[in-house]
C-alpha cells in the first residue's frame, strides 16, 4: 500500500491543497504551525476515523468551515480511492472506491498505519490499556475474526460492570461470566498468537539500534496464568462487587516490559525508552508486511527532536531497507540532508 495523492479541504489550517507523494521516504519540511503534522494527522484519520491529536472535531475542521474532506488515491497494487467527510453536528461519510461504508473497518484494513510521534513514547509509562492496543492492532490485521471477538468481549465486560453497579443478583453475574469466559479464551489465544510473532522481531530490531540493551518482554493475558478465568472471577467476586468493577479479565491484558523483574522505566534512560518504542513500532509494521499484501505505512512526526543524531541515522537507515512508504516531518531541512537520496521525496510547506 502506498499513497500517491492526498487532497485536503478545510482540514486544520489547510483550506484546500493537493499533495503528491512517492512510494518511498517522503520528507515534509516546514516551520511550526505550517501544517506538516496536519498532513500526517489526515492520513491517520483516513485509516482510523479519528485524530491522534484531538478528540474534538471542531478543532480539526477549519474555523472558516463546517466540514472537512480528505481524499486519497492509493495503490495496493491496484488503484483504490478513500475519502471521508466530517461535519459539525452531522452524519459522517466514509467511502472506499466511491462506495459509502457502513463502518470504517474495511478502510482500516486497506490502510494500515504505524505512527511514531512524541506521544508514542508515553506507551511505556501509561497504563496497560495503551500497551494492549499494540496487541489488538496486530491481531486485527493478522486474523479477520479478531474484531468480532474483541467487540463481543468488550460488550460483556461492560455489561458485567453495569450489573455490578446495579446490584444484580449473583446468578445473573454468573450468566454473563459464562459468556465472557468463552470469548475471553478465544481473544487471549489470538492476542498470544500475535505476541509470539512480535516479541522476537522487537529483539531483532532493537539489536540494530543498541545491541547492549537487555530487557524482558512478556505477555499478561489479564488474569492468573495458572487459573481459568471462571475460577478467578468466582474468587474475586466479593472484591469486584465491593468496587463495582471487573478487576480481572482480557480488558486487563498487557505487554510487560522489565529488566530483572524491575519496570524498565526504573532502568532505561529516556533515550533508551524511545529506541524501544521505535523498535516496537517498526516490528509491528514488519510483521504486518510479512503476513499481508498491503504494506504498512509509517508516519513519523518530528523524530529529529526526540532522538540524537546517531540514533536518528540508525532509524532512517533501517527505514530505507523496508518496502514501505514513510512520511517524516521535520522543522529543519539541514537535520535530514544526510538521509536524503535519489529515492526520497521532499515536500516543503
From Swiss-Prot:
Pfam families: SMC_N. One of its GO terms (cellular component) is cytoplasm. GO terms for biological process: DNA replication; DNA synthesis involved in DNA repair; double-strand break repair; SOS response. Keywords: ATP-binding, Cytoplasm, DNA damage, DNA repair, DNA replication, DNA-binding, Nucleotide-binding, SOS response. It comes from the Bacteria. InterPro entries: DNA-binding_RecF, DNA-binding_RecF_CS, P-loop_NTPase, RecF/RecN/SMC_N, RecF_2. PROSITE patterns: RECF_2. It is found in: Cytoplasm. Belongs to the RecF family. The RecF protein is involved in DNA metabolism; it is required for DNA replication and normal SOS inducibility. RecF binds preferentially to single-stranded, linear DNA. It also seems to bind ATP. NCBIfam families: recf. This is DNA replication and repair protein RecF. It comes from Francisella tularensis subsp. novicida (strain U112).
Amino acid at each position: 500500500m502506498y499513497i500517491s495523492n492526498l487532497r485536503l479541504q478545510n482540514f486544520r489550517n489547510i483550506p484546500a491543497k493537493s499533495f503528491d507523494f512517492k512510494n518511498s521516504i517522503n520528507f515534509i519540511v516546514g516551520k511550526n504551525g505550517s501544517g506538516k503534522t496536519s498532513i500526517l494527522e489526515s492520513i491517520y484519520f483516513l485509516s482510523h476515523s479519528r485524530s491522534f491529536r484531538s478528540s474534538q472535531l471542531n478543532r480539526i475542521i477549519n474555523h472558516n468551515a463546517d466540514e472537512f474532506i480528505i481524499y486519497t488515491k492509493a495503490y495496493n497494487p491496484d488503484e483504490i480511492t478513500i475519502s471521508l467527510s466530517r461535519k459539525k453536528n452531522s452524519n459522517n461519510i466514509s467511502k472506499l472506491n466511491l462506495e459509502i461504508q457502513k463502518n470504517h473497518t474495511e478502510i482500516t484494513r486497506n490502510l494500515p498505519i504505524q505512527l511514531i510521534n512524541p506521544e508514542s513514547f508515553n506507551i511505556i509509562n501509561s497504563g496497560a490499556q495503551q500497551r494492549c492496543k499494540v496487541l489488538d492492532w496486530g491481531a486485527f490485521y493478522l486474523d479477520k475474526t479478531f474484531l468480532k471477538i474483541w467487540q463481543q468481549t468488550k460488550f460483556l465486560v461492560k455489561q458485567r460492570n453495569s450489573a455490578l453497579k446495579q446490584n444484580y443478583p449473583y446468578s445473573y453475574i454468573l450468566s454473563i461470566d459464562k459468556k465472557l469466559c468463552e470469548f475471553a479464551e478465544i481473544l487471549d489465544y489470538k492476542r498470544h498468537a500475535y505476541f509470539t510473532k512480535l516479541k522476537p522481531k522487537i529483539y531483532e530490531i532493537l539489536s540494530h539500534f543498541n545491541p547492549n540493551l537487555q530487557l524482558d518482554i512478556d505477555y499478561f493475558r489479564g488474569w492468573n496464568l495458572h487459573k481459568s478465568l471462571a475460577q478467578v472471577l468466582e474468587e474475586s467476586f466479593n472484591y469486584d462487587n465491593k468496587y463495582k468493577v471487573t478487576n480481572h479479565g482480557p480488558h486487563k491484558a498487557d505487554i510487560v516490559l522489565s529488566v530483572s523483574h524491575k519496570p524498565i522505566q526504573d532502568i532505561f534512560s529516556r533515550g533508551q525508552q524511545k529506541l524501544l518504542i521505535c523498535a516496537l513500532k517498526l516490528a509491528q509494521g514488519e510483521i504486518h508486511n510479512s503476513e499481508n499484501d498491503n504494506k504498512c505505512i509509517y508516519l513519523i512526526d518530528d523524530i529529529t527532536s526526540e532522538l540524537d543524531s546517531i540514533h536518528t541515522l540508525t532509524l532512517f537507515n533501517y527505514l530505507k531497507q523496508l518496502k514501505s512508504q514513510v512520511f517524516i516531518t521535520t522543522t529543519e531541512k539541514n537535520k535530514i540532508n544526510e538521509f536524503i537520496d535519489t529515492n526520497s521525496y521532499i515536500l516543503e510547506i
